[in-house]
Amino acid sequence: MQNLTISPLSTLPQVRVLGRCAGTDPLTLFWTGSGIELLFTGSELWVELNADYDTMEPWVSVELDGAWISRFAVNPGTSRMCIFRGAAPGRAKHVRLLKDVQAMSEDPAHLLQVTAICHAGGEFLPLPAPRCRLEFIGDSITSG
């Protein structure tokens, strides 16, 4: 592990928050599919997560350049998950980290937060605007 720079999400305006989330320090991921998306040109990238649960552990999925590369349960407490290291510096890598389970109302202790991005070298680039957007109109189940 190189010397990593630890950056709270609030210091990285290029990181896109996905889903309905409030605040960024820490970013609490409550809903399925909520997460973060970013473009990074460095050689090493880690995500610092905070999790808790009594019976139903939180799971996350990671996509790198459009390919699903990992799915894992997050252990209780604060931990760092390596997204990539030893990657070609200077080339932009497109990363998405998504909560892979639903909100767990049966487990009041269930918690998943992104607390920081840890990185070596490179820079965060602005993401292009999404090609299309969907709007769901419906009852309280659909709209919250």
Language-model segments: residues:
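N-terminal secretory targeting modules
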Residues: 1-137, 142-144
